[in-house]
């Protein structure tokens, strides 16, 4: 049993959720020379489910190499990746405000899926889980989209929204994992961590 975990994520939401579980962790962030964004490139014809799981596993591989380079103790590493999809279209992080507005307009009045993959990597191998949730947005008026985008909240978030923030007013219904939609499904994460021998 171990009580140390490395979290390879810059997301403040994932940190909050991991703390909510009562897990003690240390951050294992990318080095300046690592191109973390390159890991998130979508392959032609790749399904959203395959995409999010592949990216999460690649993040785990990169974090294992980082841990070895830094000579850190052999403790489990947690990575996660979230994507929003409408049909087969992957809606990643918006490039800019205009892109964010277009994404939100495409989600207005529809039901979309939020996929969050989780990987726990140890020297013995990797364990994976996938959380799939359905989120229904009410119709969102153009001025509402404009105000929300102007707040800056959509930037840096898959699908151009954070469910725990101002976008909560757009959410008519959720079917699935609220914490998964935020970026770290706690049920699946806790199970993977315990399987990896983490004590919390």
UniProtKB/Swiss-Prot annotation:
Residues under site feature: Important for substrate specificity: 13, 82, 164
Chief location: cytoplasm
Location in the cell: Cytoplasm
Record: active site: 81
GO BP of this protein: nucleotide metabolic process
CDD domains recorded: Maf
Cofactor(s) this protein cannot do without: a divalent metal cation
Keyword list, A-Z: Cytoplasm, Hydrolase, Nucleotide metabolism
Catalysed reaction equations from the record: dTTP + H2O = dTMP + diphosphate + H(+); UTP + H2O = UMP + diphosphate + H(+)
A Pfam family: Maf
One GO cellular component term noted in the UniProt record for this chain: cytoplasm
Top-tier EC class: hydrolase
NCBIfam families found in the cross-reference section: maf (TIGR00172)
Sequence similarity: Belongs to the Maf family. YhdE subfamily.
Descriptive protein name: dTTP/UTP pyrophosphatase
Species this chain originates from: Cupriavidus metallidurans (strain ATCC 43123 / DSM 2839 / NBRC 102507 / CH34) (Ralstonia metallidurans)
């Amino acid at each position: 049993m171990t009580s140390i975990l490395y979290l390879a994520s810059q997301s403040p939401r994932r940190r909050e959720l991991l703390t909510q579980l009562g897990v003690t962790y240390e951050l294992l962030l990318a080095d300046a020379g690592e191109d973390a964004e390159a890991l998130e490139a979508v392959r032609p014809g790749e399904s959203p489910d395959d995409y999010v799981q592949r990216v999460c596993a690649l993040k785990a591989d990169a974090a294992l190499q980082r841990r070895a380079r830094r000579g850190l103790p052999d403790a489990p590493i947690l990575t996660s990746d979230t994507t929003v999809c409408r049909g087969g279209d992957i809606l990643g992080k918006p490039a800019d405000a205009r892109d964010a507005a277009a994404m939100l307009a495409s989600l207005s009045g529809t039901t979309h899926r939020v996929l969050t993959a989780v990987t726990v990597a140890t020297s013995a191998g990797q364990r994976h889980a996938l959380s799939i949730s359905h989120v229904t947005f009410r119709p969102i008026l153009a001025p509402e989209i404009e105000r929300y985008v102007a707040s800056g909240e959509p930037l840096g978030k898959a699908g151009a929204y954070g469910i725990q923030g101002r976008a909560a007013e757009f959410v008519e219904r959720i079917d699935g994992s609220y914490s998964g939609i935020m970026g770290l499904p706690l049920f699946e994460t806790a199970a993977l961590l315990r399987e990896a021998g983490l004590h919390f």
